């Protein structure tokens, strides 16, 4: 997809990978709707707000709007899409990036379990339901679901998060099959190397982050996926594989990715991306 002149929604755009992706899309010529909870008026403990992201974009001459959204609330997710259409125009690109997690496996209270699934899985489904009719009508569009190595591996205390990400990757596969006849690609971008987003740095403050990727590296990968032909759909693109096969994201160069403490690995299911 040629991103110039397109309208994009990025969830979780107040900080980290979401903010970096919103900025990168604006630099590519998109008008960007930035959605999340944190604003200047209603900040969260972790640094970063929607207003920060929008200022970065508009100060550089781009177009962006902040759409405060509680992604655990169905009506607010639908309103996010409706507001984007009202303020920027029909949605061409949806990046389902927002995610939350809580520590705990089987002992995790169901209220928190449900909240993880509401934000990490249900919100992407509802947002997709809201944007797809317009994409089908126009015969174009693209959706990227941002996943994690937790979809394929067990990290102690992250059972619900891993389950939600695994389901999100299945959503990609299912949507790709349904939307292929309409020329609308749906792909997964899997973050499978450490990224120094504000949230993870705060949560893992005792770990050395010096060789972690900056969020901008993940954003570069997401835009690479969006720029592929519409025939490239239903794929799971991992950051590590894209670095090796697509020649992007070189900040860690040839340094091997070290396995996180306590991680139990599963077989890697990525397929190689197409030639550029």
Model region roles, listed by residue range:
Residues 7, 14-15:
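Conserved glycine-rich cofactor-binding loop
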Residues 28-50:
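Conserved glycine-rich Rossmann-like NAD(P)H-binding loop of the short-chain dehydrogenase/reductase
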Residues 46-49, 78, 99-114, 157-160:
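Conserved mid-core segment of classical short-chain dehydrogenase/reductases
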Residues 99-100, 109-126, 140, 144, ...:
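Catalytic Tyr-X3-Lys loop
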Residues 128, 164:
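Active-site helix of classical SDR
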Residues 133, 177-178:
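Alpha-helical segment proximal to the catalytic Tyr-Lys
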Residues 148:
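Residue(s) in the substrate-gating loop at a strand-loop-helix junction
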Residues 181, 188-189, 205-275:
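C-terminal helical subdomain
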């Amino acid at each position: 997809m040629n991103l110039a002149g397109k309208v994009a929604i990025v969830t979780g755009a107040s900080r980290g990978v979401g903010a970096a992706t919103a900025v990168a899309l604006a630099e590519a010529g998109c008008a960007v709707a930035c959605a999340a909870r944190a604003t200047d008026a209603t900040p969260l403990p972790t640094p970063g707000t929607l207003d920060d992201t929008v200022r970065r974009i508009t100060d550089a001459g781009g177009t962006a709007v902040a759409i405060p959204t509680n992604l655990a609330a169905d009506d607010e997710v639908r309103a996010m899409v409706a507001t984007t259409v009202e303020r920027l125009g029909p949605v061409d690109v949806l990046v389902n990036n927002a995610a939350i997690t809580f520590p705990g496996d089987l002992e995790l209270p169901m209220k928190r379990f449900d909240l993880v699934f509401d934000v990490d899985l249900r919100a992407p489904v509802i947002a997709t339901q809201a944007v797809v009719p317009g994409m089908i009508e126009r015969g174009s569009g693209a959706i990227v679901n941002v996943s994690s190595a937790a979809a394929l591996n067990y990290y102690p205390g992250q059972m619900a998060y891993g389950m939600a990400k695994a389901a999100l990757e299945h959503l990609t596969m299912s949507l790709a099959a349904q939307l292929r006849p309409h020329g609308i690609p749906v792909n997964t971008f899997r973050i499978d190397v450490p990224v120094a987003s504000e949230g993870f740095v705060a949560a893992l403050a005792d770990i050395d982050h010096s060789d972690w990727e900056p969020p901008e590296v993940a954003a570069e990968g997401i835009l690479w996926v969006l720029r592929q032909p519409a025939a490239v759909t239903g794929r799971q693109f991992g950051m590590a594989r894209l670095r090796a096969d697509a020649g992007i994201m070189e900040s860690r160069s040839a340094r091997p990715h070290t396995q996180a403490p306590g991680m139990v690995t599963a077989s890697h299911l990525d397929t190689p991306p197409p030639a550029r």
